[in-house]
């Protein structure tokens, strides 16, 4: 077994099973490029402050870049005996450049090193996810633009309530994604702070320049307290919270896609490129994409809860428990990324809205009942009185097997003399939707304005 960096303190050797249990190289290799970036910045800072010579710093940088090339070429594959990515890099660096490689860890601990790596990693992944959110929003917006006057039943309690523009429905998810995009931007700012130079917990005796290394790494600032710097995982928890919300939004949309694709709704058809079949039932076309997204949402939420529980009992400063933050974080990042990609593809090419069925759906129920009450209220009838009257109309119409549009004018006027011929136009699905022209409503003019506003939001960086 490879000699541990810290083994001179001990007389015995580490039990192989404990070494395996302790090792994180199997998953923290994900951080290697960020570990190399942090080490390069640290080496340059050591030279700038006179702790090592410029020539030594150059050797360190060259060695670290060689490790990067080896990793990218698939030639750097440290085993579990290397313990973690930090030791693996340091050991390989020393093989490449000799004893000068042993100087890299001057004025640095693995505690501030890993904190730096994770922040660099998460900063990059946040940028990636924000772009994926933009791609998702762009497809939603494209669908909305082509379906302003396509109507779909709107629901409360999963019961038909009022018809809405399909574009209006899609834009609701656009706004959810917009909040997700904004939220990640705020979290990025709090992630973009450097703990490098905090040492193990108390800082260092060397005359380092933390601001210089932070500047080299693109951080906006440095932690003001070394204890906080090495022990803080607020940024990871905040990210997992934001990731959970993204998955909640995708899961809600997925649930609707699953319902809409069912024979009972039949609002959409699934294309062959985004559906699968059954191993036993030849007629089936299954909505696997939204079902998987719905399932993966719980996985990400579990990571959030796990991280909160992980942190709740940790005294300052660093504890080995924090090794457990990475697998949850890495998996949540990848799950959000693939889920956004899959949903974007599904919306772009995987579904077709069944226009005839949607038109039937908004015309076959009593979702225009509120408009009858509004009609009477506009003619001076107190709304609550109008509401009660229309409730009775719906009850008697159901008993007679009629819809509101089937009532004769005489039947309307027998209910209340305020009804006139224009009641029929007022309760058509198109008019019901068009009339809701309040700001943020489903009226066609409002939806067109919302699309224009969404385009402006999409151009934000």
Swiss-Prot record:
Top-level EC class: lyase
GO cellular component, one term: cytosol
Cross-referenced Pfam families: ASL_C2, Lyase_1
Domain of life according to the entry: Bacteria
Swiss-Prot/TrEMBL keywords: Amino-acid biosynthesis, Arginine biosynthesis, Cytoplasm, Lyase
Similarity-based family: Belongs to the lyase 1 family. Argininosuccinate lyase subfamily.
Note in the entry: A mutant overexpressing this enzyme grows faster than the wild-type strain under photoautotrophic conditions with 5 mM NaNO(3) as a nitrogen source. In contrast, the growth of the mutant is similar under photoautotrophic conditions with 5 mM arginine as a nitrogen source.
Protein name: Argininosuccinate lyase
Species of provenance: Synechocystis sp. (strain ATCC 27184 / PCC 6803 / Kazusa)
Taxonomic placement: Bacteria, Bacillati, Cyanobacteriota, Cyanophyceae, Synechococcales
